[in-house]
């Protein structure tokens, strides 16, 4: 009985040991399984961490690219920030030919301006460039130096035809650009010629046929030669430069430019320079440039006008405008002055009136013979003192040295035109100049537009007692002289017509003008009978006056009831 019990116990112990071994095996297997799962989890985690690192790396790379673009470090976007227009980068640092280097030194240049430092190297490398810089920043050398170097390296000769074309908005700017090009080409064998409206077309065609490697042109005349001068060899064109693109488009050359771009070879380098980046300029850049390097100059100036420029305006009744101008010019005969008018007829009339008033002046306007216009321009450029009466043909791009005063006798069409007009003075580092805008009381709200455009102007008062007492004498001269009387009528009509076409009609409304006072400013005792072809706007004026009344606006309260916007 006991033995059987013992055997039962032993058998029971064996079963227990068996079960425990089974449990241990199960536990061991479970542990191994758990360990395997953990290992797999670790591997998965490591893989995901690697992916995260890769993604983070890509994000960081993108952020670095964005930062580089914002900082102007990206190759396609060069933003130059600094004080003034000059840099400490020398022309010697460029890899230029000996001939060009000698010419630059002979011209008296050692250091580059900001637009030159940003544009010349990319252009030398054959890249397209879209340059944005204000007037007087040195854009001409920025594109002419690479143009001359390109012609030299490609070994262009007259038989190769034209390798570079430069398009300018005005004849005067084209003339000035050609002069600079001639100085740069002084020690080179390459040739330069100019094709502009007003010149003898046949002579231009002969020069082109003989082989002009560098052609400076205005849009209309260039298109004429491209379409009609069979001997014009432009199939080897390497580079097209569009200077003052915004002004070209403002002068309604958009259609001509599109035709020119269609005719010229597509495989070329293109450089486009513009003081302002309007929507039309961007459209032109889009169709003419390929992956351009953007060069944007920020010279650290808060003002949009030149640094050394003092700007003011005076409010004068219409009938006293002419007397004020004569008095001012007589007191400043030893200065170099440019006076801007809205029309050619007005320039012609005031030139005659100044002669009668013993004020020696010269004049430039679009209706002049080109030879006389060119001579007048260069005479005024070289003069240390003198008075030039002009239209806006002289408002852009021209580098006229040492201009003391810019007088805007007729107000500009918009703030940008004001900026370009006053840009003829205080040009270059450390230069000084003054500008005066003449307004009648009805035009005073124009100051709001200028201040919104960050143009700092202050009101200047004039002493009526010091004005020349010549009004009645001038009226008698105009009444007696048939030719002068006709010229005065034409100028009066042209002034009103230009006024009526003004873009800022909320300010420059011809129906608000006191025609008797306007007539007096053209030396008439009463308004002359002229056909103006101006639609009546009396109803609109009455409505506008009511609206102005609600807001407190008037010619004598240009800011209305609300506080005027502070100048930035």
Swiss-Prot record:
Query: Which protein is depicted?
Result: DEAD-box ATP-dependent RNA helicase 51
Comment text on domains: The Q motif is unique to and characteristic of the DEAD box family of RNA helicases and controls ATP binding and hydrolysis.
GO MF, any single term:
RNA binding
Organism of derivation: Arabidopsis thaliana (Mouse-ear cress)
Q: Which UniProt keywords apply?
A: ATP-binding, Coiled coil, Helicase, Hydrolase, Nucleotide-binding, RNA-binding
Q: What is the lineage of its organism?
A: Eukaryota, Viridiplantae, Streptophyta, Embryophyta, Tracheophyta
One Pfam family, please name it: Helicase_C
The short motif DEAD box is annotated over 243-246
So what family is this one in?
A: Belongs to the DEAD box helicase family. DDX18/HAS1 subfamily.
In the Enzyme Commission scheme, what number(s) does this protein have? 3.6.4.13
Q: Which reaction does it catalyse?
A: ATP + H2O = ADP + phosphate + H(+)
Comp. bias regions, Basic and acidic residues: 1-13, 23-47
Indicate the segments forming the Helicase C-terminal domain, all copies.
Answer: 321-468
Fetch the SMART domains from UniProt. Answer: DEXDc, DUF4217, HELICc
According to the record, the residues making up region (Disordered) are: 1-70, 540-568
Q: Source organism's superkingdom?
A: Eukaryota
The UniProt record lists the Helicase ATP-binding domain at 120-295
